[in-house]
């Protein structure tokens, strides 16, 4: 399984609404279209971490391809009051919010 981690800023007290928006979004076929197998949302000191797991190592590409879908655009718009780019001056697309993995370990079974 491969993962992407989106990092952004989140308004304090908005985690329940953000979770609701994703619960509704994940109830559609969009996660399947994007290749998302699991989504986890985290917050820490007004930072937002969005971990998505994919079967293949092309999650960032699939997210980029999905951004023209009206449902993707809708959730992006719905999240704007709660989530903002970590660095608005450099953000151009969802790919600009992806953290860079610099270490990976997986136990063998």
Q: Model-flagged regions — what are they?
A:
Residues 2-9:
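Active-site-flanking beta-strand signature of metal-NTP-handling nucleotidyl enzymes
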Residues 10, 53-55:
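Short beta-strand segments enriched in hydrophobic/aromatic residues
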Residues 10-37:
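Short amphipathic alpha-helical segments
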Residues 28-37, 55-93:
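An amphipathic, aromatic/His-enriched active-site/gating alpha helix that lines ligand/cofactor pockets
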Residues 48-49:
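Hydrophobic residues embedded in beta-strands of well-ordered beta-sheets
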Residues 85-109:
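Short, low-order "capping/linker" segments at domain edges
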